[in-house]
Amino acid sequence: MIQPQTHLNVADNSGARELMCIRVIGASNRRYAHIGDVIVAVIKEAVPNTPLERSEVIRAVIVRTRKELKRDNGMIIRYDDNAAVVIDQEGNPKGTRIFGAIARELRQLNFTKIVSLAPEVL
């Protein structure tokens, strides 16, 4: 579960290293974000000499959470970290590579470009 003020790792090569969630996109009073949800975040740490800079406000989609995800078939998936992928307004990733495993639920939510770049889909 991701809520405002939560720090997340960045799972792509867009230039950002760490994000902080400042808003969960959805209903006006939505508190938590789960895998596949879009958030508004601020960059807390960035790689030098890249297009993204520190304190820049961006959109990101959650790809991994430490909170377990229960599927309809009873399988429970839990990751080691909270991670997100930086996206543009159309939902396309800004980076060209994705690091680490991502959940299969992203394909059902029309993030097919992110799924195709991922090395492992669980």
UniProtKB/Swiss-Prot annotation:
GO MF annotations in UniProt: large ribosomal subunit rRNA binding; structural constituent of ribosome
Xref: SMART domains: Ribosomal_L14
PANTHER family named among the record's database cross-references: 50S/60S RIBOSOMAL PROTEIN L14/L23, LARGE RIBOSOMAL SUBUNIT PROTEIN UL14M
InterPro entries to which the protein is assigned, alphabetical: Ribosomal_uL14, Ribosomal_uL14_bac-type, Ribosomal_uL14_CS, Ribosomal_uL14_sf
Pfam families assigned to the protein according to its UniProt record, in alphabetical order: Ribosomal_L14
Swiss-Prot/TrEMBL GO biological process terms: translation
Highest taxon of source: Eukaryota
Role, per record: Binds to 23S rRNA.
PROSITE patterns xrefs: RIBOSOMAL_L14 (PS00049)
Family membership: Belongs to the universal ribosomal protein uL14 family.
Listed name of the protein: Large ribosomal subunit protein uL14c
Location relative to the cell: Plastid, Chloroplast
GO cellular component, one term: chloroplast
Principal localisation: plastid
Alphabetical keyword list: Chloroplast, Plastid, Ribonucleoprotein, Ribosomal protein, RNA-binding, rRNA-binding
Subunit structure: Part of the 50S ribosomal subunit.
SUPFAM superfamilies from the UniProt entry: Ribosomal protein L14
CDD domains: Ribosomal_uL14
